[in-house]
Amino acid sequence: MRRWISQNNIRLPRGAFFISALFFFNAVCIVSDNLLIIESFGEMAYNISYLTRVPGTNTLLACCCLLRPEEVNSEY
């Protein structure tokens, strides 16, 4: 079972944006505590500042900051 981590103190980095209702559990793979690979978005990696479930649904609400490609490659 996947664990979804949400932080109480939300710090929004510059350039952060909100994504909601499109992240289905079967399309999201957590590879570290604060990094997601969104398969439905062509495996683009996001640094997650805030992540929580949307009550009563199978979706997530996340505040994301898109990582640069060189940052993504360094994780592998």
UniProtKB/Swiss-Prot annotation:
NCBIfam families assigned: PRK09891.1
GO cellular component, one term: plasma membrane
Name the record gives this protein: Uncharacterized protein YmcE
Keyword entries, A-Z: Cell membrane, Membrane, Transmembrane, Transmembrane helix
Subcellular location(s) per record: Cell membrane
Spans through the membrane: 18-38
Taxonomy of the source species: Bacteria, Pseudomonadati, Pseudomonadota, Gammaproteobacteria, Enterobacterales
Organism: Escherichia coli (strain K12)
A Pfam family matched in the record: YmcE_antitoxin
Stated induction or repression of this protein's expression: Transiently induced by cold shock in a PNPase-dependent fashion.
Main localization category: membrane
